[in-house]
């Protein structure tokens, strides 16, 4: 396999299918453009699927989990043991994403890339341990090169499994105490913004905690001397196993021809890494929502993304993306099942 597979070409959009979808939209029994963004979504999905009338019956959700060494710096309101506990909750069916996946009839895969518990073995979890969490990036690089490449590959492999199952839409979620700190550090590097403008409460830090979090990030960025034009170095130095896996998954989706629905702040950081590594993948990314973390809007702006929802979410897990799936499905159903003017014998122009 190509050792820099993430640079391989992405699938092109089917412009003929998009033209057919646009033509159909003009014939549906409604004023042109009256369904707003739903029309654009249907046309975009037509281009992604290569058909005039797309559908999203097959949705695959993968949760990537990993712990973060930077938690040693006191940047989280929760202990790292929660990561492993939540893995049990995911496969036990009690987490928000578990409930949403059931309601959507979506597949749910949970991948452990490295929690702090080296003995964690849970039925239903795919354990691909790369270490007992990342190293503390406030003192040294978060990942070795081998760990970074393995995490990217883990994301790719998850997509290949989803593709074999016929997935039409991929949602990546994440779990890892401390991962908003890693995401903010990455965002600060890639966007060239001060960490204090991008750092938020995560799982519930108070004002002093957020300030400390930003200070830890700023010191780490000075330590590593990161550059915005080297996203791979930044990912390895201050990222996380799950963030790297998400980036790898998004790139693989674009190469395999599977649409992606990107979740919140952490997933959007991974999306920006993916786009910086291979700009062609951007066309395959849809963005579910604008979350409550202060850095999320800056990321969406950098990605020129129009989020579908704004509900003040900051849970992660892929939950915001799952919430947006019914909207995408309804866009497809309206596009595919509304009558045309000719079928309904309705005048197609004003008097």
From Swiss-Prot:
Keyword Glycosyltransferase among UniProt keywords: yes
Catalytic activity: 5,6-dimethylbenzimidazole + nicotinate beta-D-ribonucleotide = alpha-ribazole 5'-phosphate + nicotinate + H(+)
Homology family: Belongs to the CobT family.
Protein species of origin: Pseudomonas putida (strain W619)
One of the Pfam families matching this protein, by short name: DBI_PRT
Record-linked SUPFAM superfamilies: Nicotinate mononucleotide:5,6-dimethylbenzimidazole phosphoribosyltransferase (CobT)
Pathway(s) of this molecule: Nucleoside biosynthesis; alpha-ribazole biosynthesis; alpha-ribazole from 5,6-dimethylbenzimidazole: step 1/2
Superkingdom of the source species: Bacteria
GO annotation (BP), single: cobalamin biosynthetic process
Active-site residues per Swiss-Prot or TrEMBL entry: 317 (proton acceptor)
Assigned EC number: 2.4.2.21
Protein name, UniProt field: Nicotinate-nucleotide--dimethylbenzimidazole phosphoribosyltransferase
Function: Catalyzes the synthesis of alpha-ribazole-5'-phosphate from nicotinate mononucleotide (NAMN) and 5,6-dimethylbenzimidazole (DMB).
Gene Ontology MF terms in the entry: nicotinate-nucleotide-dimethylbenzimidazole phosphoribosyltransferase activity
Xref: InterPro entries: Nict_dMeBzImd_PRibTrfase, Nict_dMeBzImd_PRibTrfase_bact, Nict_dMeBzImd_PRibTrfase_N, Nict_dMeBzImd_PRibTrfase_sf
Keyword annotations of the record: Cobalamin biosynthesis, Glycosyltransferase, Transferase
NCBIfam families to which the protein is assigned, alphabetical: cobT_DBIPRT, PRK00105.1
């Amino acid at each position: 396999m190509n050792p820099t597979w993430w640079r391989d070409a992405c699938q092109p959009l089917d412009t003929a299918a998009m033209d057919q979808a646009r033509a159909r939209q003009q014939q549906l029994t409604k004023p042109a453009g009256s369904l707003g963004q739903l029309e654009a979504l249907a046309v975009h999905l037509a281009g992604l699927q290569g058909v005039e009338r797309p559908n999203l019956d097959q949705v695959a959700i993968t949760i990537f989990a990993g712990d973060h060494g930077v938690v040693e710096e006191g940047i989280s309101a929760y202990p790292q043991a929660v990561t492993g506990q939540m893995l049990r909750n995911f496969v036990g069916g009690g987490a928000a994403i578990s409930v949403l996946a059931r309601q959507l009839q979506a597949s749910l895969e949970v991948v452990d890339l490295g929690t702090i518990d080296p003995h964690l073995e849970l039925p239903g979890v795919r354990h691909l341990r790369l270490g007992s969490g990342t190293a503390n990036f406030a003192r040294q690089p978060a990942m070795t090169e081998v760990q970074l490449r393995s995490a990217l590959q883990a994301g790719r492999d998850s997509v290949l499994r989803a593709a074999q199952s016929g997935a039409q839409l991929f949602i990546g979620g994440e779990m890892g105490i401390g991962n908003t700190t890693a995401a903010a550090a990455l965002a600060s590097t890639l966007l060239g913004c001060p960490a204090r403008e991008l750092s938020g409460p995560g799982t519930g830090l108070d004002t002093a905690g957020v300030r400390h979090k930003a200070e830890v990030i700023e010191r780490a960025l000075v330590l590593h001397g990161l550059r915005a034009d080297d996203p791979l170095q930044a990912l390895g130095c201050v990222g996380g196993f799950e963030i790297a896996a998400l980036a790898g998954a998004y790139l693989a989706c674009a190469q395999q021809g599977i649409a992606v629905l990107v979740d919140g702040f952490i997933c959007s950081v991974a999306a920006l890494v993916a786009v910086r590594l291979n700009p062609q993948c951007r066309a395959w990314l849809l963005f579910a929502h604008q979350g409550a973390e202060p850095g999320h809007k800056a990321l969406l702006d950098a990605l020129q993304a129009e989020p579908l929802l704004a509900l003040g979410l900051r849970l992660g897990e892929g939950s915001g993306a799952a919430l947006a799936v019914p909207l995408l499905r309804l866009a497809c159903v309206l596009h595919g099942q509304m009558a045309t003017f000719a079928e309904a014998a309705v005048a197609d122009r004003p008097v």
